[in-house]
Amino acid sequence: MRFLGRYRLIVPAAVAKPSPSIGQALGPLGINMSDFCKKFNERTQAIRPNIPIQVLIYTLSNSTYKFALRTPGSQWFLRRIARVPMGSSKPKHEIVGNVTLKEVYHIAKCKSMDPPLIGIPLYVICKRIIGTANAMGIAVTRELLPEFRKRDYTKVSQLDQMKKDIRMQRRSQKRGKR
């Protein structure tokens, strides 16, 4: 049994299906899609459905595999907390959202359970998350800025649809310029 490689996927929790997106990644590796989906859904039952879970798949020479689960990326957490569908197109010049240090700390607590971050002090993880927030155009402050106090009225479930709408608008604007 020889180690062949490590592959990354992002799969929605508890609702993985043998779909083309998963099939294109697992097919060349010789991994049975339905078997993977069944095992993945069993391990992610306790997690809220449709949360994008990072999966590391380790393939072995005898067509077997092991996989490890990680929490969603920091960007996903920041977008959900700040209630913004996308990051800023001009990060240092345009602020699209706001999160507090307390919220950053909660994200860091969640991320500290990831295998690569075990043993790293929380303040270091917080610094990384603050850097990610700055790169996305999300301000990090002690208290919420007055212009972002209404963020709690935006439903988190609408963020993905808002993101799709923004992308469609940008595509149509690009087509109009040609």
Language-model segments: residues:
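Generic preference for flexible, low-structure residues
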Residues: 23-25, 38, 42, 81-85, ...
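Positively charged, low-complexity, intrinsically disordered RNA-binding extensions
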Residues: 95-178
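Solvent-exposed alpha-helices and their adjacent loops that cap or buttress functional pockets
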Residues: 1-3, 58-59, 131
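Intrinsically disordered, Lys/Arg-rich N-terminal extensions and targeting peptides
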Residues: 1-31, 156-178
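Short, ordered loop/turn segments at secondary-structure junctions
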Residues: 14, 72, 143-146
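Residue-identity detector for glycine
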Residues: 5, 23, 27-30, 73, ...
